[in-house]
Design a protein with these regions (language model features):
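Feature recognizes metal-dependent phosphohydrolase scaffolds
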Residues: 1-232
Length: 232
């Protein structure tokens, strides 16, 4: 009888996303949701992002990792889903060892030690540059998306340290981009390509992540009309 009380109180549960956003523990929420007797989900943009990442889309993978890094939630990937971030961490240390990465500081988390924070900032910068490249490659392959204005790396004057756009110049706050080739700024280095191939396999082969995303797909939609109410 005790177990039946929540069912009698809440006959059907609507979850209006995002579930995956800046906060900790979305995998814990998903585990709980999957046990509920009657539920539907209206996806948020971050939920769609993670579904894309689970499908192996590299731009989505890099973006999901970047958000986790920025808000101090890399444990979602490592502990929650068992995704190995060591190759990315090693690459970040080797590439930005002497760079304080002050433009890539963490937000919303005070639980890290100084060394952990420094490591996360380097990983944040590394995956951010990878994301810019991955998205640039996608936009180039699909001009029909009309997203060319989102590509900025080719607007940087690396000799003068400015970004030229719309007839104006903007002083860059950070010019340490050793992995960006000014002649081909959206190309991965061999190390970046290897990291992304590993991460692609890790996301696509993570059983728990795949279960969670299949549940979102089965129970979710962009919007839902319920009792004459629009949920989105």
């Amino acid at each position: 009888q005790t177990c039946a009380l929540p069912i009698l109180t809440v006959d059907h549960l609507h979850i209006v996303g995002d579930i995956y956003d800046r906060g900790p523990g979305p995998h814990i929420i998903m585990d709980k949701m999957m046990t509920y007797h009657s539920i539907d989900v209206q996806w948020g943009n971050h939920d769609v992002l993670w579904m894309g990442a689970a499908a192996g889309q590299m731009g989505c993978i890099a973006n999901a990792i970047r958000i986790c890094a920025r808000y101090g939630n890399l444990d979602i990937l490592e502990d929650g889903y068992g995704i190995n971030l060591l190759p990315l961490a090693t690459f970040a240390i080797n590439t930005y060892g002497d760079d304080p990465c002050t433009c890539f500081q963490l937000k919303g988390s005070d639980s890290y030690s100084a060394s952990e924070r420094e490591m996360n900032q380097k990983m944040h910068k590394a995956i951010s540059i990878i994301q810019f490249k991955a998205e640039g490659q996608i936009i180039k392959r699909h001009p029909e998306f009309g997203l060319e204005k989102r590509n900025l790396l080719h607007h940087i004057d690396f000799e003068r340290g400015v970004l030229e756009m719309g007839g104006k110049e903007y002083k860059m706050l950070d010019m340490n981009f050793p992995t960006v080739d000014p002649k081909d700024p959206y190309a991965f280095t061999p190390e970046e390509a290897d990291i992304m191939e590993r991460l692609e396999r890790a996301f696509m082969n993570c059983e728990k992540l795949q279960q969670h995303m299949k549940f979102l797909l089965a129970k979710g939609s962009l919007y839902k009309v319920y009792n004459n109410n629009l949920l989105y």
